[in-house]
Amino acid sequence: MLRTMTIVRANPEGVHSTPGYHHVTVVPAGRTAYLAGQCPLDAAGALVGADDVDAQVDQVAANALAVLRSVGAGPKHVVRTVIYVVSADRSVLAQVWQRFLDSSLAPAFTTASTLLGVAQLGFPGQLVELDVTAALPDTP
């Protein structure tokens, strides 16, 4: 028999409101997937969108979706995200956040999420990286 996993996302009373994400995500014991940091690299390993934060977000989202699908999951199974952006400019951080919210990965960002401006990422020209944790759906 297939069990239905319930992921509970909440914003407790007494804590500030959020622009769409939740302060806490509770997952029953089960299988989890911890994705490596998703970078704006194409299948050949080449950087996509040097100096183009939107192109990099699009590639990162596509990569994250492909990796999630490879383990039978999708954006609705994501329980935590951390977005790293090479910028100290809040408008750039907001642009990246909005671009992810406008992507097919958008449901992943209704969960516990963190958005950070950083000094540097691993590849020359890399502006965006995404860490994802997902609670995998039960299997028959």
Predicted regions located by residue number:
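N-terminal presequence-like segments and the immediate start of the first folded domain
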Residues: 1-62, 66-79, 85-140
